[in-house]
């Protein structure tokens, strides 16, 4: 079992994609893109035209000013984040495995997998709990909230708990425990 884990980890490092030095499909940094700047100017211009319809210091006027500042800040952050824009002026996410673009796709992707694993682990534990009660079907339909919250509060350590169960052999069901529907 440990040999498989070691081989898997070594395989992960060996199979990392080699960074290519070619451009990324004609994309340019957003801060250098004329179309990106045109989109910023267009968005701000639309908001300023709406702003001219209101008296200064009125709630709608102040709300639009805030919206203009948020729009400018968003475009500035996109430009400073090193995102690449296409000919349409929109930022494009690069998902090719390069570490220089890890913040665009890999980091949010790993965060998504962590949250999805948390939800799955908590659900798995709750279903296992429900199967050991007097009325398991009822416990699955009508969720026992205090019990579910206790599972949720401990679910954040799911990667370690899953690894522990995997190494102890409790994570994967045995062949004779898996039911097969007759056909």
UniProtKB/Swiss-Prot annotation:
Signal peptide positions (record): 1-20
Family: Belongs to the PsaF family.
Originating gene: psaF
Annotated TM spans: 102-122, 141-161
Coiled-coil ranges from the UniProt annotation: none
CC per GO annotation: chloroplast thylakoid membrane; photosystem I reaction center
Purpose: Probably participates in efficiency of electron transfer from plastocyanin to P700 (or cytochrome c553 in algae and cyanobacteria). This plastocyanin-docking protein contributes to the specific association of plastocyanin to PSI.
Any one biological process term the GO annotation gives: photosynthesis
Descriptive protein name: Photosystem I reaction center subunit III
């Amino acid at each position: 079992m440990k040999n498989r884990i070691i081989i898997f980890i070594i395989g992960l490092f060996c199979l990392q994609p080699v960074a290519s030095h070619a451009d990324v499909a004609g994309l340019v940094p957003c801060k250098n893109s004329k179309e990106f700047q045109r989109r910023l100017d267009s968005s701000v211009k639309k908001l300023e035209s709406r702003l001219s319809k209101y008296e200064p210091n009125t709630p709608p006027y102040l709300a639009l000013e805030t919206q203009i500042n948020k729009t400018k800040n968003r475009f500035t952050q996109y430009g400073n984040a090193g995102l690449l824009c296409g000919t349409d002026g929109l930022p494009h996410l690069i998902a090719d495995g390069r570490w220089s673009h890890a913040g665009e796709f890999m980091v949010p992707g790993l965060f998504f997998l962590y949250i999805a694993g948390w939800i799955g682990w908590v659900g798995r534990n709750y279903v296992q709990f429900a199967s050991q009660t007097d009325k398991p079907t009822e416990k699955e339909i009508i969720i026992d909230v205090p019990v579910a919250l206790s599972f949720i509060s401990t679910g954040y350590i799911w990667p370690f708990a899953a690894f522990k169960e995997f190494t102890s052999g409790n994570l994967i069901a045995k062949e004779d425990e898996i039911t097969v529907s007759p056909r």
